[in-house]
Amino acid sequence: MKRALSRLIAARSGLLGALSAAALGLAATSCEAIRNGANPEMPLWLQRPNSAMQVNYSRKLVAPSRRAGEPYERGQPEIDPVGKRVFTGSSDNGLYALRAANGEQIWRFETTGFVQCAPLYDPVEDVVYFGSNDGAFYKVSAKDGKLRWRFMSNAEVSRRAVLQNGLLYVVNANDTLLALEPATGKIRWSQHRSPATGMEVAGYAGPLLFRGKVYTGFSDGNVVAYDALTGAERWQPVDLAAEAEQTLGEVPQQLDVDTTPVPNMLPTGPVVYVASYAGGVFALDAETGVQVWPNTAVTGVSELTLWREPAHVRRDGGPPEPARSILIASSGTTGLWGLDPETGRELWRREVPSGGVSAPVPISGALMVTASRMGIFLVSPLGGELIDGIHVSDGTSMTPSAYGARAFVMTNGGTFLSLTVASPI
């Protein structure tokens, strides 16, 4: 284990050199001290790009004998900062509870399918909700992993559920949105659209709860808003394929909306950001579904993230920097994009390694992403420049989770990693 970790860290320098020339580029801008998360003009990372990200520990979590033929570890860990625990799924059909300090296993819950879902921890009940590729959605005790209830949704569940309004909102791969009672797992209401078989690529959107409505996207290219309590449609389905056809002059071959909608408040009102795989990225009015702006050049998008930076005082004594935000789009075909949230205008674009990258996760003023065929990277949200990277021989497909300066992720080889990102001083 120690020898493998040493090789992993030793490969960092060569990896950074290769990527700076062929993919993400070398860092030119980074982040301010952790006290405000801002990005100074001359960050420490500019002088020490190879020491921003450190591995605290690695733990081989998934035994080769238990793997069930899935070469990737997907989903995203869930952090319980009070209990100092991390919950993560695996390709060995299990959900693990680990001690955040050292990665030691607390318990493991067995399902009959890959657990590629991002778990949801509820600190009020001290329980974990998660889905499996066996088609079931589970509620288990966070203390000992004992089953509370299981709901069969009849299709894989890999997106994180949302707990709000006294209901659990769950989406499965069969284009079904469910509102479940947390105490029993019984259905309060459900909505379903016929899947566009053969017109989707991979993955699907999760639920967003925003201003009393639940938003999600479907494989037929539609985005719909429902009343969070009753499930009634709150605006007519928005067909992003039709929107893209008007711009492109033809119907996209891949209709699916794979990104979980992302909310924002613009000066003109509330919006949700969504992406059609072949049609581009769109901002929709959150109240009506009317298009605010499109960017049809940003195709192949699987994840969206809204990065924010608070207003701050420059360290060089210059004028105060205003608050700013950037919409980050992850695409395995067109790269990593930074877009203006108000207009959709491209601010920057970076090529990514073959196989694409995960959703970017804000940490210490930067963004952490993983590459399915390479490893873990830290990039600047202001320009996408590479700050640091760690090569992983099996690659890393799982989206990392961050709390403060700590991050957790599992590699495709089944090794669970704890990392620290040092902020510039």
List each model region and its residues:
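Loop/turn-rich, solvent-exposed surfaces of beta-rich toroidal or solenoidal domains
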Residues: 330-337, 345, 349-378
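Extracytoplasmic beta-rich repeat domains
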Residues: 35-79, 108-124, 147-164, 187-211, ...
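Hydrophobic beta-strand positions that form the internal "hydrophobic ladder"
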Residues: 86, 128, 168, 214, ...
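Short coil/turn segments within WD40 beta-propeller repeats
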Residues: 93, 134-136, 175, 221, ...
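C-terminal motif of bacterial Sec signal peptides marking the signal peptidase cleavage site
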Residues: 27-30
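Short loop/turn segments that connect beta-strands within beta-propeller blades
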Residues: 99-102, 141-144, 181-185, 228-230, ...
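Residue-level marker for isolated small/hydroxyl-bearing positions within beta-strands
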Residues: 89, 131, 171, 217, ...
